[in-house]
Design a protein with these regions (language model features):
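A short, N-terminal "cap"/entry segment at the start of jelly-roll beta-barrel domains
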Residues: 1-44
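A short beta-strand-loop-beta hairpin characteristic of the jelly-roll/cupin
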Residues: 45-47, 52-75
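A generic "binding-loop/recognition-motif" signal
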Residues: 25, 48, 85
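Short strand-connecting beta-turns/loops that link adjacent beta-strands
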Residues: 26, 67, 94-96
């Protein structure tokens, strides 16, 4: 990949696209491209590592099991997710390309 905006899928792609940008012991950086996808009903991420995520382009709604309100993320917003903090993607803008930069790090 030549850049964060390179090789983007069409806005009508049925699956999210995950691209690993860098991997080192205790560190993984990936680009995630969503085009309207969200977490399956009832599914929660519960990851052993921390994750810092930046929304580069688009809109998304992120929900945490320990928060009553959903977080609406816009381009430029970021969140640091502690290990084992249950979370899910409730919504990404349908028909639009949403680009995430996710940094997974050992706790």
């Amino acid at each position: 990949m030549d850049g964060i905006f390179a090789n983007l899928p069409r806005s009508t792609a049925t699956d999210e696209q995950f691209s690993q940008l860098l991997a080192r012991p205790g560190l993984r950086i990936e680009r995630i491209v969503s085009t309207g996808q969200c977490s399956p009903a009832g599914f929660w991420y519960d990851q052993p590592d921390g994750e810092w995520v930046l929304l580069i382009q688009g809109d998304a709604r992120l929900r945490f099991a320990d928060e009553a309100e959903v977080r609406h993320l816009k381009a430029g917003d970021f969140v640091d997710i502690a290990p084992h903090r249950r979370h899910r993607v409730d919504w990404t803008a349908p028909g639009e390309i949403t680009i995430w930069l996710a940094v997974h790090y050992a706790a």
